[in-house]
Amino acid sequence: MDPDALFALLNRYFEAIAEPVLAEQGLLDKFIGDALMAEFGVPRHRGDQQEALAAVRAALAMQANLAELNRELEQEGLEPLQQGIGIHFGEVIAGNLGSSHRLEYTVIGSPVNLASRLESLTRQFPQHPILISATVRELLGDHAVVQCLGLCPVKGWPDPIEVFSLQALQS
């Protein structure tokens, strides 16, 4: 694919996945290559369970939007796209980070790293595109249908973590 077509495709993809984040009052932090980093609960926090529910609603809507985009791509003779989503919840440091020449509002901390590691694990579980931590699972309570994938080793963590596949939300 030529560079112009690749950029056009990435922009279509980002449009499809950014909308659900904004609809759930999430923050679009940054686009990194073909990835989107988003947060919920910063700079305003609505409560732990509310933020966890907003994040998983956005993730499920992102999956639905990707399915629609893939139908369009297939009609255009292009290969479908795949995505993996990792969701974790925890205390982070939020603020402007960078140099005097360029500052960006972002979050840092181990919860950010663990969410990224969960996203990476989706490559090992391609049939489970949305992975959540035990912390998120607990916050969701009976609102979510999940499948436990067991304890998984995670780069940078001393012990394996319990990983769940998000299937759906219950009304």
Report the location of each language-model feature.
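Catalytic core regions of nucleotide second-messenger enzymes
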Residues: E24-Q25, D29-I32, Q63-G86, C152, ...
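Conserved, well-folded catalytic cores of nucleic-acid-processing
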Residues: R46, M62-N65, L69-E72, S100, ...
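Alpha-helical scaffolding flanking metal-ion-dependent phosphate/phosphodiester catalytic sites
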Residues: A55, I87-G90, P111-L118
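Allosteric regulatory "coupling" segments in signal-transduction proteins
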Residues: Q49-A52, E104-I108, C148, C152
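Catalytic NTP-binding/metal-coordinating core of nucleotidyl cyclase/transferase enzymes
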Residues: M1-R57
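Catalytic strand-loop-helix junctions within cyclic-nucleotide turnover domains
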Residues: E39-Q50, I85-Y105, T122-H128
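Residue-level signature of catalytic and energy-coupling elements of molecular machines
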Residues: I17, G33, I87, L118, ...
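Cytosolic regulatory/linker segments at or just downstream of nucleotide-handling modules
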Residues: V92, A115, T122-S171
